[in-house]
């Protein structure tokens, strides 16, 4: 089960635009894994072919947290079903915990599990712009966006 940032809305069009892979809304996850997180992070940055196409994270980092255990932080923009778990599996990592720490402009921060908060005015403004534009034209991280080449394996 994934935990962390979850956006709730009654706007079906906005929900579709925010979650559809073609919108390329960036999401950041921290996966606590067993395996070689350092090697996996290097491999992930080169791209990993899954059954539904190439996964190319925009950012990856790994931090050892114990013997054979790592926190691997990944930022992805595709948002395909179980993409992070499938990516980790393809890299021979066993996922123990998966936390979505950021979804577009919304950061988890110090919000405790099971707690909720309203979006800030700025988050609402950015989400409105993203859903109006279809997501691709607005980089929610404020930095440079890495170009990705998508290949379908069909």
PLM regions with names:
Residues 1-154:
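Basic, flexible Lys/Arg- and Gly-enriched helix-loop patches that mediate nucleic-acid binding at interfaces
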């Amino acid at each position: 089960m994934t935990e962390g940032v979850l956006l709730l809305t009654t706007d079906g069009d906005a929900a579709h635009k925010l979650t559809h892979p073609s919108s390329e809304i960036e999401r950041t996850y921290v996966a606590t894994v067993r395996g070689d997180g350092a090697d996996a992070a290097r491999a992930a940055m080169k791209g990993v072919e899954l059954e539904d196409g190439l996964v190319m994270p925009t950012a990856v980092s790994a931090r050892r947290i114990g013997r054979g255990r790592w926190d691997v932080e990944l930022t992805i923009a595709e948002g395909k079903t179980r993409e992070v778990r499938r990516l980790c599996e393809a890299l021979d990592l066993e996922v123990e915990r998966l936390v979505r720490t950021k979804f577009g402009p919304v950061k988890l921060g110090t919000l405790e599990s099971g707690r909720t908060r309203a979006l800030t005015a700025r988050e609402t403004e950015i989400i409105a712009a993203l859903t109006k534009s279809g997501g691709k034209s607005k980089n929610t991280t404020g930095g440079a966006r890495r170009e990705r080449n998508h290949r379908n394996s069909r």
